[in-house]
């Protein structure tokens, strides 16, 4: 009855059915062929209702929040929409139905006895059959799907029945999954400690969002041309539609370009395009498009039909992984190409409906699985940015969608692409506080102001904390109501206000204690909001560029408390506060490049050299291991060396987790085996395991692999595999996951060869036929470790299952094993000895009292309490089987008494566990006597109340355990009414919330008094040692579970004596079971049960088994019953006796249990596996005595290290210059080169001609300030090599001195520019001297390549560093550079690389001593002092640092330029670096409109005459690859072609601009209008192209080529390729000619078109390859298509023998036999 949690600031992103989507969904069927007779015309009557009615007419509380059964409306749009559409058809109106839908909706409170999952199913089913009624033509297609749906509904009903009864079932009868190993898909999202849990409370606000997200992967767009669908893994990894494939699918009868007269326009549209002659001027400009008729009734923008896709997908090889959202306001834009032809659509209808039916089934299943809990918590933050909610509007019928249904209200401009979209409303506060935060530069994190929830606020005076769609919580903003009302998603704000208003009204009825509890839950909500802005982990990086072209490193951030699917790309300056996480990521990337050692080699080597660990290893840094833990580590190490798989069976609380983690640390650090290791644990202990890994082994790359399918796929993409060709193939060291994920992703995980497998709570493997058992047994593992605190509580068969899992070869035959040890219960000495012998190598078992003497004692008291009168009444009814009274007033599941013992145990706990008692006696929540009724109805609660009051006064903290979840609900309600702060953890609590609850309870200043736990929830790792009192409210059937519960508090770290109070109802079945269990069951549970695998009793020679036979059960039931029936019915006297109980008297009278874990027999059996006996028989006494000196070990390690080759420089050696042999025509010199040449001639005008130095290719001899002495020229050149930036001209001049220092600053800059220009000219003229191009700089030979690279690198470095406020802590290198040979000796890492570059910028390249002495850089102890010689130090000296720094600068250049630095790119490295150097220094050309022109690739020119070719190792070209010469020429030619096309089409620039804008606005316009506009634009452009071709060329062959060049230029303004545009235009022209009855056009007629098609096909067959597919970071899809074109694979091109003989069109038909594919065009 958790009323507080209901009103925590739960995000409302998915709670509301977006009205816009309703309209879109309705449109789907209205526009289908079945409904073409419906008048689809938009008219004012469709929108004449009051816009404010929807929000001002406040329905019953909670109406704005959907019930779970409405989830299907979102996800299965078509079938459900048809249900609502029928009413619309009868009215003859295709307008909105949203308002009436909301008015007619039922109150959102859960109906008594109803199951929301069933409601969901029935609602879906009703809608689905309604679809059949209205769509008779489709009924046959859906029959089979309906049958399947019915079958699935039956299955779901069974599941719901199971769930509805789950709370009543005691813990021992439920599977462990239902307690603490439930997967995240079917868990409650709330923390029970935060309030009541009343299923009938009308104020409960169930959240449907979880069902939406649980289906995020199955809810895939079924339209085959939705480029952003989640179809990567189902369709060969394609992220986008391949347009060339679409060409193959297109039909000559393509309906995409039908005239604008679609039937579904209701006759309101005009018939356009009556004649072929279309005006070149667009009669309706884009600015004149008016969509006012299609406005939403409340003035907000409709969200896009398809949201931004998950950016996390494995894309095609070689593609850069793109951003989810680069622009903070980016919205998805769709192109007209997203629609299929009508013919394709009709053919695919059947498939689409089958797909919908299947998805509907999946949705119902998921809805049925979701636990029905109260008030979903805001911790669940599945972002709709990355876990996309798919609208099923885009089905195969989308061609007929009514225009207006897909439109948005465009208030100002149709191209308003940067609008904000509200994803979540997180909090609210008084207006102005947000501005104050910004003014004072404070954090935007909200604070809890209790006044906000005391009175109903004026929402106009409030501001809201908004999480924007596509952005992280880091970018949340405070916005007022007026700021938000015109934004998409505004309805979420309205629903948030309704929710808060209802909560405020409800708080007025609460007591002060309840309000305090409510405030605590809100503080925890705020904690989670803060958490979501904290960086948990960086999982990827990339290089992007800002608007100025500057390099911006970006990181993919996984946020604290959010899943991998909600990771976002962030700029490095935005997450500067998380520099530690960035450095950890960089360090992980470095470690991946290091290959590990082989297991068998290290095992053999370790046997000979390894000694026992007497001290804790230095790599284990989280604390100090205790002696027995170090002994346990030695046991694990010894077992690994002997290749023995083992069970670590220490008692609860002895630190098995730490010992296991240490073993993996030993493999990674001591043995250099980096994994991969697999650790499988229960969900409840997952967070604790991760925390222990981070604490003890912070250097280990541990992946927590859980979550939804989308999250796990993101994790696989970025965290699993190393795609680089160097290093190990698996990135992570250890993978931490749960049992359920292992089963779900068995196909993925089984492919990995695991070095070590650990299974926590290994009794999950006791059934050798279970799925988990068989799955893990199939995994490829070198060694295994099972971790369990209760290794021998199982039967002989189950013990064999564990041993068989460890060693299938040794323990093959189960029957033989069982036969050998079937008489263990008789304690046959020979059998025990044999068992010890077999198990000794495999088990290590210690108990607390043997090894942990310092742990305070625990005292257990059994408190026997009487039953209350109501309990006695129900106890009698159960014994009498009085169903009439037991089920009085019950509407749901009735008491069946199938298990009468369980029902009696429920009665002993609390009669309110029976619905009839709760309904009849419980009272209303607002009743003042509610607390008294709860307490007095149960004798146990009476004693608990007295006990807790006493413990509260004496400052104790309490753990309360119960088996029954419903009992925990009652206890939670009691604690809330009492005003006691508490936390709660049971099987339905999500993993992250479990950890949060434990952390909150264990916090030093925590005010939590109680912690409610399910007896079995958790396992190893739930450490609540801050509590010193344990209350076992009801004893478990298995005493071992109660012992485990006690160990939650009585464990290492406990400082106080632990008092344990076990409640037992006297004279009841409970007391008798406890007594009999003490006498008969304890030994069996602790040693070996006497049950076989089927759970039946086996025949025994001696003792009976643990199950009770018929006579025993009868005796148990009779116990106390006689006295109960003899008692006089005097309820008042019984009540007085209960109230008069004195707690002190009860405690004195309590039976005290001595602290004996086991008896002597059990001790004897398990004693064989204690510390002293962990070595197996193979070990002799001298194994650990093979002492060798530690120094010798280090020496041996260094001697055995692989002899790595010396690092070769990864940058380009200037001695391998480019071998370009073609000269550029004089007339075709680029304008920037011409300007520079004129500048050079101007500077040289003053000086008489001086002969060039020998071997130089260019000369700088003139300076406006006068002559430069050779000595100063030498110094100037060297100093420029040091600083490289004219911004540091003062430093350069000061260091040079002489004439340069005396010259004015303008002259200094002029000299700097002259040096750079001269080097460029030297490179361009292509000198082939052995040392590369050399410049004659005032008589000083300057290596041009070397200087240009240095200057370019230093300038890039300066620009990058200038972005940071604190460069020393924030600046990092862009990419990883392999460590040098000397790195290991001084501990050099990537941070030192960054500091070295900073020192170079501050002090100059080569000034190593200044860099060393700069204390801020922290390199004093990592660089050798200048006075030390090579043999005197292992630290890097000047040559080492120069080599490292040069390589780093080149790596920075390569990363910033987007070049591939992998080995496969090395073939063209030297040439491309050279070209890049030239182009980087050129100012971007500007075209006539002032826009940035393409980055020109200059054709290198040389002097006339024969060349002296430098002999060098030839670069081998792969087959089909173009030569360097031909490639450069082709690039130049294509660039000139583009300039020419731009000139001749300059008159059509307006049309081209409109075509480009249409790419980004087509999603907002009706499809027919889009097609009409495209047709018009293509007709205008096509006619102009035809005229240009006829004007310029007479040769048909060249006409074809010129036509394609022009269309390729047009394609830079469109999403389609030039070939596709040409094909569409030709088809349009042909159709127009056929309509007019005219023969082939005189302009490029049909014969020419056929020849074009034939020629295109031939060209494509030789050279065309598929376009790369990927998601780019740009805002518009048009830009994406164009950028993707840049990556087109180039086909083979002929070597041009003499470029002077070629015209601008290149060689004619005789020069080449095939059409060369053009290189990619730069974006315009």
Swiss-Prot record:
Residue ranges, compositional bias (Polar residues): 25-34, 362-376, 1658-1667, 1692-1702
Sites where the protein binds ATP: 650-657
UniProt motif Nuclear localization signal 1: location: 320-327
Residue ranges the record marks as coiled coil: 138-164, 505-525, 1126-1163
Acidic residues bias spans: 145-157, 170-186, 239-264, 278-297, 337-350
UniProt motif DEAH box: location: 760-763
Recorded superkingdom: Eukaryota
Chain intervals with Basic residues compositional bias: 301-313
Chain ranges of the Helicase C-terminal domain: 943-1094
Family under the similarity heading: Belongs to the SNF2/RAD54 helicase family.
Protein name, entry field: Protein CHROMATIN REMODELING 5
Organism: Arabidopsis thaliana (Mouse-ear cress)
